[in-house]
Amino acid sequence: MPKIKWTNKDFNVFKIDGLEQRMNALNDHVRPKFHQLGDDFATYFSSKLGEEFFPHVAKHARRTVNPPQDSWVAFAPYKRGYKSLPHFQIGLWHSHLFIVLAIIYEAPQKNVMAERLLAHPSLFEQLSDDFIVSGDHMSPEAISLEEAKEDKLKELLLRLRDVKKGEFLIGRHIPKDQATKLTASEFHQLTEQTFNSLLPFYNVIVGKDLK
């Protein structure tokens, strides 16, 4: 049964001053939920995509001064890491919950991945207008897919292809006020439905479905 219910306390972790204090709150309140989601959705991805997926809960281990502004659990078919691969994420900023598929600048084949997405524009027509896209995983900002279809979508994909720091994220952002009202069952259902919609994108990105 779904177990994860988000609260204001979870989101307010990212308003706590100080690295140690914020990390302690993150470890106490948020990371246990990410670990649970990691177990649940690693099984989901392994079943849906036909290879073993592993959860990676953000550790923020390199931080020595500035506290993290967001945190997440990522999913990829590699036990030792995820950043060099296209990967799925569930995470929080202080303002919203995010459920996304991401290609970040550390992916060595991101130019090829971008070309595959550019060659399949019809994929984006299959998503509802409440989906978002972004070109920066370190920013909470995003643009609605409906608005991006005019010209920003192609611009983001070309940047992913041509610019070393180019990135591409697609999925849903759920504002804090909405996320905290979701029951555990509603959140699980929304997350699974979002990922179901993103699976065809993943298959195209990794070259599994290039019809």
Curated annotation (Swiss-Prot):
Protein name: UPF0637 protein Bsph_1379
Superkingdom field: Bacteria
Family: Belongs to the UPF0637 family.
Organism: Lysinibacillus sphaericus (strain C3-41)
Organism taxonomic ancestry: Bacteria, Bacillati, Bacillota, Bacilli, Bacillales
Leader peptide range in chain numbering: none
Gene3D superfamilies, A to Z: Protein of unknown function DUF1054 (3.30.930.20)
